[in-house]
Amino acid sequence: MRISSVVEHRTPRVYVCYCLRSLSRPNQTYIGSTPDPIRRLRQHNGLVKQGAFYTRMARPWTMDVVVYGFPSKLAALQFEWSWQKPHASRHLRVMHDDGTRPNKSSATAAVYAGRSSKPLFPATRSSAPSSAASHDSGLNLRKKNRRVRMRSSTVPEYKFLVLRALLASEPFCFWHLHVGFYSEYAYGVWQFMDRANPTRYSVSRITRRPLPPSYPPVACDFRGVQGTNTPLAPPQDATAHTLRTSYPVLPEATTLSAAQKKKRSTSASCAPENEHMWAEEIPHARDAETLGLTWEQLEHAPTIARMEVPDGLMQASSAARGRSRRLRSHTSFLEALDQDASALEAHLVHASRKDMSSSICGLCGGHINRHVPLSYTHCPHACDAVFHLTCLARYSLEQETRAHARTFCLPTSAWCPMCQRPPVPWPEIVRRVFRRAELKVSM
């Protein structure tokens, strides 16, 4: 029997929002979410029954990018809806240049992006019911009352703009979400936009709150979500100079982007795809030279970042790994997601054994109730320190206040006052607290 995450919160091991790109219609995409990306892609391509009815006319599909690390399934669905409908999302609204109300400084005022503001990405097209029955009686009356649906562009590069805007906007920028790329083309588009705005993710878009230096974490696996693609490889006799100055031949370079089609089109009614208020532009072509994607950049593309676990802890989690659900994955990218969850359980098993000896908060000195696992947390770097969750949050907020004049309710990172190691994103601390609570219930 499944338990609702609303009644009893649980952090999903793997739940991703994905962007599909049609290979038969290069300018058509589909946004969705799933706990099993491999099976979901097979459903979209008609290889597995059930679901994926909307995408049946544009097969085959390929999965270009995934966003993962959501605190709950409901959070992923919120992100998916905003990615699908940026023109209607309240999180993607036009704000003042400094992110504040008029006549107020950024240190004292925060702005909520309500529906009264203009959308960052206005609707670019509209759809209405078919007029095939134009000769039916009473059609004129029905045409007056029919509803016109506003839609957002489905161009792949446009969806990348929306993704970057969501990752910079509240509350998504504080969830420490990860981005994974499964194609060289998708990684090249991301790099193209990243070079144009290298400080895009230094602060949040609305409250101007500093974000972690490595946000958002990016990883690549060019073998595809199913592990069946062959990554592009440079010539065997390529020199270091050749790798820096030459460009790979992308399969997507043979397709026309929306900008190229606009130049060739003579119709004045064709709506441009770059009519948006987001301060980034779409590349005008899909070849590697336009994207600035060299062989050297492909060789140094980031892979999945593994979680650091102290030596000897993996053996302690063998039983926990046996109880965990394994994804039917053939790629290191998805395997790493589940392996990180197993490593996290190993860390929590090791830390839970110290509960008897460490029952004093390292900050306030008060007693820690071990029977309420959601009230305390261990050091994120596996030292012996234990803290009340509220005490660690208060201490971390004090560290942030030194660099930022404003005070917030929750920190973006957690500092351990004992070991003085680099900070860890606060969502990771919360995720470990809930995972430890689940582990104690199952033990």
From Swiss-Prot:
<dbReference type="GO" id="GO:0000724">
    <property type="term" value="P:double-strand break repair via homologous recombination"/>
</dbReference>
<dbReference type="InterPro" id="IPR027520">
    <property type="entry name" value="Slx1"/>
</dbReference>
<dbReference type="InterPro" id="IPR001841">
    <property type="entry name" value="Znf_RING"/>
</dbReference>
<protein>
    <recommendedName>
        <fullName>Structure-specific endonuclease subunit SLX1</fullName>
        <ecNumber>3.1.-.-</ecNumber>
    </recommendedName>
</protein>
<comment type="function">
    <text>Catalytic subunit of the SLX1-SLX4 structure-specific endonuclease that resolves DNA secondary structures generated during DNA repair and recombination. Has endonuclease activity towards branched DNA substrates, introducing single-strand cuts in duplex DNA close to junctions with ss-DNA.</text>
</comment>
<keyword id="KW-0378">Hydrolase</keyword>
<comment type="subunit">
    <text>Forms a heterodimer with SLX4.</text>
</comment>
<dbReference type="GO" id="GO:0017108">
    <property type="term" value="F:5'-flap endonuclease activity"/>
</dbReference>
<dbReference type="InterPro" id="IPR000305">
    <property type="entry name" value="GIY-YIG_endonuc"/>
</dbReference>
<dbReference type="GO" id="GO:0008270">
    <property type="term" value="F:zinc ion binding"/>
</dbReference>
<dbReference type="InterPro" id="IPR048749">
    <property type="entry name" value="SLX1_C"/>
</dbReference>
<keyword id="KW-0540">Nuclease</keyword>
<dbReference type="Pfam" id="PF01541">
    <property type="entry name" value="GIY-YIG"/>
</dbReference>
<keyword id="KW-0479">Metal-binding</keyword>
<dbReference type="GO" id="GO:0033557">
    <property type="term" value="C:Slx1-Slx4 complex"/>
</dbReference>
<keyword id="KW-0255">Endonuclease</keyword>
<keyword id="KW-0233">DNA recombination</keyword>
<dbReference type="GO" id="GO:0008821">
    <property type="term" value="F:crossover junction DNA endonuclease activity"/>
</dbReference>
<keyword id="KW-0862">Zinc</keyword>
<feature type="region of interest" description="Disordered">
    <location>
        <begin position="121"/>
        <end position="140"/>
    </location>
</feature>
<dbReference type="InterPro" id="IPR050381">
    <property type="entry name" value="SLX1_endonuclease"/>
</dbReference>
<keyword id="KW-0234">DNA repair</keyword>
<keyword id="KW-0863">Zinc-finger</keyword>
<dbReference type="Pfam" id="PF21202">
    <property type="entry name" value="SLX1_C"/>
</dbReference>
<dbReference type="InterPro" id="IPR035901">
    <property type="entry name" value="GIY-YIG_endonuc_sf"/>
</dbReference>
<keyword id="KW-0539">Nucleus</keyword>
<feature type="zinc finger region" description="SLX1-type">
    <location>
        <begin position="361"/>
        <end position="419"/>
    </location>
</feature>
<comment type="similarity">
    <text>Belongs to the SLX1 family.</text>
</comment>
<feature type="domain" description="GIY-YIG">
    <location>
        <begin position="13"/>
        <end position="93"/>
    </location>
</feature>
<keyword id="KW-0227">DNA damage</keyword>
<dbReference type="InterPro" id="IPR013083">
    <property type="entry name" value="Znf_RING/FYVE/PHD"/>
</dbReference>
